[in-house]
């Protein structure tokens, strides 16, 4: 493997740890609430490993997470079905809306599962989904545009 690729991959891994570390610190060491969603870990792979992918675009990260989490909370709140029926319906609807709105972000496909299993309320959309996504996007722009000098965001 060439040296430049090893360096870039190391930087991507380092920034993934820094980004998730910042969200973890905000979650556990402040009184501001929750900033972490499990699917953010997968977002790191796309954002830092494959920033040229359309799935890693800023609008896809932000709106993909927001739409699928909204679908999950809405389904949980308004559809009185057992979780084993509700979860697949919500995931399917989340995928449908991401594709229809051209905001597909594969890691966000897991958000309805997280929301329903965790019995999240609409507050969950503000924090961690919106605040966490914005923080992730800021870190992604700093790394890709200013440090690695990539054409990001597109």
Language model features with spans:
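Alpha-helical structural signal
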Residues: 41-42, 94, 110
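Membrane-helix boundary connector in multi-pass membrane proteins
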Residues: 101-125
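Internal alpha-helical transmembrane segments of multi-pass membrane proteins
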Residues: 80-105
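Membrane-helix interface "capping/anchor" motifs
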Residues: 52-60, 98-108
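Buried hydrophobic packing segments
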Residues: 74-75, 97, 113-115
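Alpha-helical transmembrane segments and their membrane-interface boundaries
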Residues: 1-74, 79-88, 119-154
